[in-house]
A protein has these predicted regions:
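Membrane-embedded alpha-helical bundles of multi-pass transporters
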Residues: 110-113, 145, 164, 399, ...
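Conserved catalytic phosphorylation-site environment of P-type ATPases
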Residues: 275, 334, 371, 381-457, ...
Length: 734
C-alpha cells in the first residue's frame, strides 16, 4: 500500500545537505518519491508500506549523518522541541564566537607585533574555531565518512587551513623568513569567518522559522484534549488522540471543537472563520455538522464524532498545505542538480586558484594564493540557491492558506500565473448556491402524496436546486423511491408505487414525451423572464407542478469579475439554466459573455475549445456538475462548499466560496513566482560575481584581493537576504 508522509529532518546545514538526504531516501527500497525541503527542514516521502517503514527510513538517514523524526504521535511537537534545542545551541555558539573574536580582532590590529599578543590570539582563535565552531568540523568529518561534502566542508576547510597555516607560522617563523617571505598570521580571519557564519545562520534560522508561521498557526488550531462521555454517562477529559468515530463528545462554551461531528443535543453559535473566512459565527443545532478547530461561543452542545485525528477537515487542510509547501517548482529540479555538485566544484575551483597564483605570481603567490583559496571556499554559498525557491513557496502558499486559498502544489502557482481566461459556473460560484423557491403552481388533482414523492426524489439529488425544493416542501418523505437516476444537466427520475416520476427541466419532460399543462407553461415563461429558474415535476403521464427558484448573486461576484478584467483576464459564465435567467445573472455580475443550457459534458467541451483557441483556462466551480470541466482546465479552482470530487480534482480550493478569492489567488501566484525569480537571480548572480572576485580576478587591474573576513560576511548574509525577500510576501496585499 502506498502512503505519503511528511517527516521533520534534523541536522540540515545547507542545500547540499537536503540534496544528500533526498538522495539517501530515494535510494531506499520501497520509496517511490522523496523530496527534502531545506527551508522547512521536512521530508515528504511517498513509500510502499509493504517494503519499508518510517523506522527503516530513519535509520538510513541517521547512517548518513542526519536525523528523521518518526514514530511519534505528535511529530510536529517533537520537531519543534528539536528546533528550539538546536536554535539555543546555535545562539550560545554564536555569542561565544563573537565574544572570543572581538579580542582576537583587536590583538591583530594593534598587538600582533608583540609575541604575547600572538599567543593570546592563538588560544582565543582555537577556542572560537574548534569549540564554538565545532559544528562545522564535526559535520564535515561525518560527511567525509559518508563520502560526501557540504557547506560545512567548505567552512571547515577554509578556517582550518587559515588557522593551521597561522599556527605553523607562529611556531616556525624562521621557515618563511629564510626564504624571504613574511610569516603572516590569520587567526583573526579564521575567527571572524566562524563568527560571521554562525551569526548568519542564527539570523537565517530565525527568518526560516517565520516563513513557517502559517502552517504553525493551522496546527495551533488543533485542541490537545477532548471531553468524552463514557458508557456509564460520566464525562472524562482525555488526549484528543484517544477519540474515535462514534464517541459522544461534549463541547463547552469557549472551547475548540476537537473532532468533526454531528450535533445531537444542545445548540450554540460556532466561529468557523478558520474554515470559511467568514467572521460571523454560525448557529449550530441538532443535525448540523461541526468541524475540528472551530470555536464554540456561549452555548454548550454534544456531538457524535464522525471523523477524528488525521481524518478531520482541519487535518486534511494542514496536510494539503504541507504537501504544497513541500512540492517543487519546475525550476527547482535544476537548482537541486546545481546544489548537489556545488561544493565539490567550488573545492576544485579553490585548489585551481591556489595553483594558478603559485604559477603566475611566484613572488608572493603562496600567501596570496592561500588567501584567495580560503576566500573562494568561504564566499561560495549553495544555501542561497537552496533557499531561493522553497522559502518563497512556503511563505506564498502559507499566505494563501491564511486567506482561505488552498494551493495544491508549486506547479499550480506557475499555471495560475499564466491564466488569461476564467470560466465560471453559475450556481454556487457566481451565485450563493442556496436557491429559494419563490412560487409554486400545482396541477389539479394533486395532493400530499405527490408532494412526498417530489420531496423524496429531490432528497436523493445533491443539486442546490433540489435542496431548495426540499426546504420549501418541508415534509418528511414517507414514500419509498426506487430506480433513482440522475440525468446530468436535466434532472432526476425515480419509481414510487409502480409509477414513474420526473423532476427537472422542461427539456427532460419533453424528451420523455410527457404532456405539459398550458397554464403552467405560460406561468413558467413569465418566471423565466424575471430571471428565475424553473423546476418541473411530472409523473409518467402529465406535469404535476412547476416551481420558480431564485438564487441570489454573491455580494463579491461583481467585484471579483472587475478585478479579473483589470488583470487582463477574460471571464465567461456557463450554466445549465435558461437563457433569460443566465443573462440576468451575467448582467448583474458584470460578466460580458455566457452560455446557457449547457450540459456537464458540454462544459468540458467548451473548456477544450477555449484551450484550442490559445487560451490558458481556469475553471471555477463547485464540483456538482462541473468535475469534468475542472479536470479539463489548465487550472481548476473549486469553491469550498463543493463535493469531494471537486476537492480531489482542483488545483486551488477556495474555502470560503467567496469569488473575490479567485483574483487574489491569481495575484498571489504572480507575487510568489516573481519572488522565486528574484531569489534565484540574486543567488546565481551572487556566486557568479563573488567567486571570481574572491579568486583575485581584480588583482591584475587594481591590486584588489578580497579579505576572507569580508567573504565570510558576504556568504553569511547572502542566504539571509533571500529569506528576507521571501518574507516580504507576508506583508503584501492580495
Amino acid at each position: 500500500m502506498q502512503k505519503k508522509e511528511v517527516f521533520p529532518v534534523t541536522g540540515l546545514g545547507c542545500a547540499a545537505c537536503a540534496a544528500r538526504v533526498s538522495k539517501v531516501l530515494n535510494a531506499q527500497p520501497g520509496v517511490i518519491e522523496a523530496n527534502v525541503n531545506y527551508a522547512s527542514a521536512t521530508a515528504m516521502v511517498c513509500y510502499d508500506t509493504d517494503k519499508c517503514t518510517p523506522e527503516s527510513l530513519g535509520k538510513a538517514v541517521a547512517d548518513s549523518g542526519y536525523g528523521l523524526i518518526t514514530a511519534v504521535e505528535n511529530e510536529e511537537d517533537a520537531a519543534e522541541k528539536e528546533r528550539l534545542k538546536q536554535y539555543r545551541a546555535l545562539k550560545w555558539q554564536t555569542v561565544g564566537a563573537v565574544v572570543g573574536t572581538v579580542p582576537v580582532f583587536v590583538l591583530s590590529m594593534f598587538f600582533m607585533d608583540l609575541r604575547w599578543g600572538q599567543w593570546v590570539a592563538f588560544v582565543l582563535s582555537a577556542t572560537v574555531v574548534f569549540v564554538f565552531g565545532s559544528r562545522f568540523h564535526i559535520n564535515a568529518w561525518r560527511q567525509l565518512g559518508n563520502r560526501a561534502v557540504n557547506m560545512d566542508t567548505l567552512v571547515a576547510c577554509s578556517t582550518g587551513v587559515a588557522w593551521m597555516f597561522s599556527t605553523f607560522n607562529l611556531l616556525f617563523p624562521g621557515f618563511w623568513l629564510s626564504r624571504g617571505i613574511e610569516p603572516h598570521l590569520y587567526f583573526e580571519a579564521a575567527s571572524v569567518i566562524i563568527a560571521f557564519i554562525l551569526l548568519g545562520r542564527l539570523m537565517e534560522a530565525k527568518a526560516k522559522h517565520k516563513t513557517n508561521k502559517a502552517i504553525r498557526t493551522l496546527m495551533d488550531l488543533r485542541p490537545k484534549m477532548v471531553t468524552i462521555v463514557s458508557q456509564d454517562g460520566t464525562e472524562k477529559e482525555v488526549p484528543v488522540q484517544w477519540a474515535h468515530a462514534g464517541d459522544t463528545v461534549v463541547v463547552r462554551p469557549g472551547e475548540r471543537v476537537a473532532v468533526d461531528g454531528t450535533v445531537f443535543s444542545g445548540a450554540s453559535y460556532v466561529d468557523e472563520s478558520m474554515l470559511s473566512g467568514e467572521p460571523v459565527p454560525v448557529m449550530k443545532q441538532s443535525g448540523d455538522k461541526v468541524f475540528a478547530g472551530t470555536i464554540n461561543q456561549k452555548g454548550a452542545f454534544r456531538i457524535k464524532a464522525d471523523k477524528t485525528g488525521q481524518d478531520t477537515v482541519l487535518a486534511q487542510i494542514i496536510r494539503m498545505v504541507q504537501d504544497a509547501q513541500g512540492s517543487k517548482a519546475p525550476v527547482q529540479n535544476m537548482v537541486d542538480k546545481v546544489a548537489s555538485v556545488f561544493v565539490p566544484v567550488i573545492m576544485g575551483i579553490a585548489v585551481t586558484v591556489f595553483l594558478a597564483w603559485l604559477v603566475f605570481a611566484p613572488e608572493d603567490g603562496f600567501t596570496h594564493g592561500l588567501l584567495a583559496m580560503i576566500t573562494v571556499l568561504i564566499i561560495a554559498c549553495p544555501c542561497a540557491l537552496g533557499l531561493a525557491t522553497p522559502t518563497a513557496l512556503i511563505v506564498g502558499i502559507g499566505k494563501g492558506a491564511s486567506n482561505g486559498i488552498l494551493i495544491k502544489d508549486a506547479t499550480s502557482l506557475e499555471v495560475a500565473r499564466n491564466i488569461d481566461m476564467v470560466i465560471l459556473d453559475k450556481t454556487g460560484t457566481v451565485t450563493e448556491g442556496r436557491p429559494e423557491v419563490t412560487d409554486c403552481l400545482w396541477a389539479s388533482g394533486t395532493g400530499d402524496g405527490d408532494r412526498m414523492v417530489l420531496s423524496g426524489l429531490e432528497r436523493l439529488s445533491e443539486h442546490p436546486l433540489a435542496e431548495a425544493v426540499v426546504r420549501f416542501l418541508g415534509m418528511e418523505c414517507q414514500v419509498e423511491i426506487s430506480g433513482f437516476e440522475n440525468i446530468p444537466g436535466r434532472g432526476v427520475l425515480g419509481m414510487s408505487e409502480g409509477r414513474r416520476y420526473l423532476a427537472g427541466s422542461l427539456e427532460l419532460l419533453r424528451s420523455e414525451g410527457i404532456e405539459v399543462d398550458t397554464a403552467m407553461l405560460k406561468e413558467a415563461g413569465r418566471w423565466q423572464n424575471e430571471a428565475r429558474t424553473v423546476v418541473w415535476f411530472a409523473d409518467q403521464d402529465r406535469s404535476l407542478a412547476v416551481l420558480a427558484v431564485t438564487d441570489r448573486i454573491k455580494p463579491t461576484s461583481a467585484e471579483a469579475v472587475e478585478k479579473l478584467r483589470g488583470m487582463g483576464i477574460r471571464t465567461y459564465m456557463l450554466t445549465g439554466d435558461n437563457e433569460a435567467a443566465a443573462a440576468a445573472v451575467a448582467r448583474m455580475a458584470g460578466i460580458d459573455e455566457f452560455r446557457a443550457g449547457v450540459l456537464p459534458q458540454d462544459k468540458a467541451r467548451f473548456v477544450k475549445e477555449c484551450q484550442d483557441a490559445g487560451y490558458k483556462v481556469a475553471m471555477v466551480g463547485d464540483g456538482i456538475n462541473d468535475s469534468a470541466a475542472l479536470a479539463q482546465a489548465d487550472l481548476s479552482i473549486a469553491m469550498g462548499r463543493g463535493s469531494d470530487i471537486a476537492m480531489d480534482t482542483a488545483m486551488v480550493t477556495i474555502l470560503s466560496s467567496d469569488l473575490s478569492r479567485v483574483p487574489e489567488a491569481v495575484r498571489l501566484s504572480h507575487m510568489t513566482v516573481r519572488t522565486i525569480r528574484q531569489n534565484l537571480f540574486w543567488a546565481f548572480i551572487y556566486n557568479v560575481i563573488a567567486v571570481p572576485v574572491a579568486a583575485g580576478i581584480l588583482y591584475p587591474v587594481n591590486g584588489f584581493l578580497l579579505n576572507p573576513m569580508i567573504g565570510g560576511a558576504a556568504m553569511a548574509f547572502s542566504s539571509v537576504s533571500v529569506v528576507a525577500n521571501s518574507l516580504r510576501l507576508r506583508s503584501r496585499k492580495l
